[in-house]
């Protein structure tokens, strides 16, 4: 009976668990896992092929080879289950226990675990407070370590060489002190550590010491010791006395044909360990000489090292073929390791793959599945059906039936796949639209048919792409596939909320051709009663598609919505001036859209907008139907259009010859100048490249103008210009294929080409493809083409790696609640650069939730309440009432711990509604940023010479009409001529409209002359300010007489004569070129008033001192009277070095990795007044005195551009030395919001340049993850260590606990971690280990005895549970609630029993089972 019960017990559900703990195993634990000791290195008997007894594959230890059969064959069959054969000692059970039973090896001498020794920082070193080098010398028998000094002056854990040891023994006598070698010595040291006492000591020393280095060292050691104390792990367990042996099925020995065996490398490594161990045992029994034993112990240590992590120390052990053996560590790490190969990426059954072809007749939610493929994929379903229908009695019979492919099987297949969606996936799956569900339609042939509109989402084309098909098996899976993944439910890109089902190429061309209008087309001016009349006229060739006609068109307007939210429509008939094509197309327009959306030429962008409008106004279902109809019409009409390409369509502009000869003449001129030494070679090259670049643009412009328009005769007989019907122009203009740049190469000139190293070849290709290239031109062209291919390969790899890092850092960010109740947010404005609105306010706030009321600026009434999700209609309203700043919620300020709340995230862009709880917004953000990565460039842009000179502006003018306003940072003085001279470094001028809304903003540089006043009303085109673009002035802010200091000709300044004008100026000499004595002198000028007293800065005791920088041209004389706003000196900016600007993918990676740029800008640490201190060698000392009078010093390299001057008041976080900003500084000085602005804007700049749209919130989500750790500043009464880095949520939890007890909470500073670092420092060690640096992560986690709470998605995928996102979140929540309820019930029962004083029953057989965690 018991056996029967056991049978039922085996199919138990696996235990539920909520966390996984990792730790060090004690020797007892290892022995408890083991089923026996492996004593021999033998594997299997070469004659019988049976495992050797006590060997590495021993059946007695690890279990039988065949199910329910012992080795010698005495016991066979199920009835003997559990019997242990008395002859061969094998237990009769399932053979699969050989996958789970472990053995062990009793080591004759203890050995150190290499991970805790060599994985930096060395954990052994930290615990023992010894250096790694010393420990290694002891372990590998090169030195002794003192364990017990006894009465001798030696110190504990002192290292001595063998000669020293012998000498000391002679000196103090044998046995006076104890010193040992090898792992035994280290083990004894570890045993002797009193952790409690050590911790007290370190804490005391931490309080006492002041040195940074010591604090760091102590804190590290304290952390490790406290971890040991907390986790109950003993330090001596880092030394192995027993070595576990992996189950044999996990390191198999496979017979190959030809009598040889393929074996796992682990067997070789284990064999080595066993051999050396046995030899050592024998030597110890024989009492061999110490030196031989030592050598054997060292070899054993090395063998164990190799088994655990081959190659970590010394040379890697190699097999017979000189290849390093694959150790246990290599099994789990890297791309092919256990984590990434088998746990995160599994192969799936019920899947197939095939080539895709276009399926133009499919509906959007369908795909064509080849019959044979479907038959194979749905086999089990067919078997089931055959059995239930009684056609086959057994599975075997059903199999036969299916293989013979009888008609009944095909009927059943049709039935089985009806309403059963399949999932199609195209690799690489870069975002969630890379895998979508479709309803299969059975087709003949062997290729999968794909709907043309989903190609954009899959990034698929039909040039031989393959796709994989997966079958969702369970009912839940089918339901999720249908509701969440069906192609018709995924019509928007999650990255930006634009429609993903936009037609392209031939469809666009067909729609564009149909909706173009033509002057004097056949039948122009006719009027039609309705659309059917138009169609009749068109089919009888009375009118052509593009003719302008008048038609009565019926539009349907929404009257009201009924109770279900379905709209009611009322027809409205109007006579519209339109074209034949547009009116025919209007038949497919969904109800509720006005005809005006179609009444224009439909280019690709217009079609996208049209589908977007349909989605917002008519809903998903109508949009999908409309898109399908558009597709059909487009295909049909494209064939009607008859657009083709001929060589005559490529019109070469007649001006081309002249433009090229002019350019060549200019180039000759520069060559002459270079020959006569007027310009350098670099300048000549820059100018030549510039000239040819401009020439190419001119040719291109001339060509486009010629292509764009054609002359036609209208009805009155006059000649007028109309947009051209040139085929090539129409293809480019409609957005179907090709671009102006490509047409330029066909009919203009190819232009400048780059060498493989990125530099531009100065002779351009003046020919185009129509004229043909000569051999040289062709050769130059091949350079560029080849570089393009090489770049693409690099780019794909880099982009994939960026995506992987992004996913890893955000994978655990899930929407876990609807509202966190925060009142924080960020104020959004339109993004303006150089006076142009780059991104309008409406685009930035669409789909966000307001955090403050939006107030109408005119009436001061609340227009939109707090907590409203801004949809299209509300943003229109905000635009209309003229609000220019809206405060919205953002993922950065969300107060939810371990996740995000829906309100802070806002709209789910892929669905168009407020985000649902359980949405994995982190992964979506990572995919949205990573997916377009392959479109970004890999190159760094060289800017220099001519290219940047052309871009230097010297004035700024208003683009809009309105009122000028200056920002608070704008400071200016009025000079004697009455001009306003700017003396602030960060002043900006805004132009506001009548409502006071900001229309544009312009930076006004220092020294510029303002041409407008604050509050002045101006017209568009008014100049606001002018300045000299080539020099930077130093302007006097006060009036007085100059008094030079340290301005000595030949010492600090040199006289420079201008050859042309004959005037002389003084130039400040670089300090490096001066003599030693004069190096510290700073040329500067002070001002004297009428009484010859130094002019003071108002309100202080500082004299006005104006320093001259290196290279400054001093324009005033000593003793000269100067007035406010007068220029004292000029610094030429011409000497700006050509600097590389990192662009494209590397720039994005740099921002997300939070790398500090080299030559970063220096920001003011405090608000205060600037002064200059005494200079040191090569550095200038800048002092900021804050409001309390404390001085903060900065040392700045002399060649750096200092942006501030003596006496200037700077605000905290203001830039004082020029350079690229360091994100860490921004965070420290300006806070999280500024940092977020900086990263978002910089990342967006890169993507915008490539024309890629990504919503800001995705970048904010990543920044939130980069900021999730904080550094403890003041510990308070918490358990933290000062300077420790912890998760923000952990700190908040701990602070809540402390505050609840009425104690002092800890304070913290924000930390910015790069995405790699943030991924590795996550709380989940499983997630971190599967990302990078597996060994280090696991070593650290084991010592800390870490517990992984399985919060993120990755950890759950790895342990094989449902992920806590989407439906999984609900599942886990329900499970936890159920468990809590059960616990409460159990508690209640036990309480009741207590109260009744009933002795609980003794027998509790069923209670204890299934409770294991």
UniProtKB/Swiss-Prot annotation:
Its EC number is 2.7.7.6. Zn(2+) 2 binds at residues 820, 894, 901, 904. Binds 1 Mg(2+) ion per subunit. Binds 2 Zn(2+) ions per subunit. One of its GO terms (molecular function) is DNA binding. One of its GO terms (cellular component) is DNA-directed RNA polymerase complex. It comes from the Bacteria. The keyword Zinc applies. Mg(2+) binds at residues 461, 463, 465. Gene3D superfamilies: 1.10.132.30, 1.10.150.390, 1.10.1790.20, 1.10.40.90, 2.40.40.20, 2.40.50.100, RNA polymerase II, clamp domain, RNA polymerase Rpb1, domain 3. GO terms for biological process: DNA-templated transcription. It is an enzyme of class 2 (transferase). Zn(2+) 1 binds at residues 70, 72, 85, 88. The RNAP catalytic core consists of 2 alpha, 1 beta, 1 beta' and 1 omega subunit. When a sigma factor is associated with the core the holoenzyme is formed, which can initiate transcription. DNA-dependent RNA polymerase catalyzes the transcription of DNA into RNA using the four ribonucleoside triphosphates as substrates. Belongs to the RNA polymerase beta' chain family. NCBIfam families: rpoC_TIGR. This is DNA-directed RNA polymerase subunit beta'. It comes from Cupriavidus metallidurans (strain ATCC 43123 / DSM 2839 / NBRC 102507 / CH34) (Ralstonia metallidurans).
